Amino acid sequence: MAIISVAHFLHDVYSSFLAPILPLLIDKLGMSYFIVGVISMVQRLPSLLNPFVGLLADRVSVRYFLIIAPALTTISMSLLGIAPSVVVLAILLFVMGISSTLFHVPGPVFIRRLAGDKIGRGMSFYMLGGELARTVGPLVILGAVSLWGLEGSYRLLPFGLFASIILYFRFHNVHLDLLQSERPAASGRIPKALWRFFLVLLALTFFRSIMKSAFTVFLPTFMKANGASLWLSGASLSLLQF
């Protein structure tokens, strides 16, 4: 579980690279705020596949989803600085969105099957990795840009790829379907009494995500446009998500 939590941390560190360097990307590619909103939406489009990935995770071994996802996210987000056009930038973000779905949806399934009777502790470490990454990520990418420039962000590639390599050697022979067979089979049906609860929860999550995404994506850009330094803008985002 510790390895998965560390992989979750590294994955989400890379996935938080966009907002802190948006002011630089806007200057480089000449993007309007509308275009920034569009590419941010493109990054989140693969989340529409969450229900289907979840259904798949309930039926097949998910270990390769978790093994591949950190590598995909690392590659796509480390190359943001050298994207030559808005189209290439959007493609990189779309790939990152797919890899994020492949990691975050099966991740809790993986934890549940490995944690045994300590599911709560397993999920707490898993979530800690993700939450901490949102604070550290902006500082990591700004440090890289300070050292190597915007187009030197690709030098962060090895660290994230290391996570996928470790996950492969640790879990490629772990057959979670066998672990699942030791538990009573669930019917897979949601009781009718819970449907209203899930619909309300879905609505709350949807509108909360809209507000949070708009704020976190544009905060560094807004601060930079109003005279703040790039470091202060990124640090404010880190503090907000701490």
Language-model segments: which ranges?
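Flexible cytoplasmic inter-helical loops of multi-pass small-molecule transporters
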Residues: 169-190
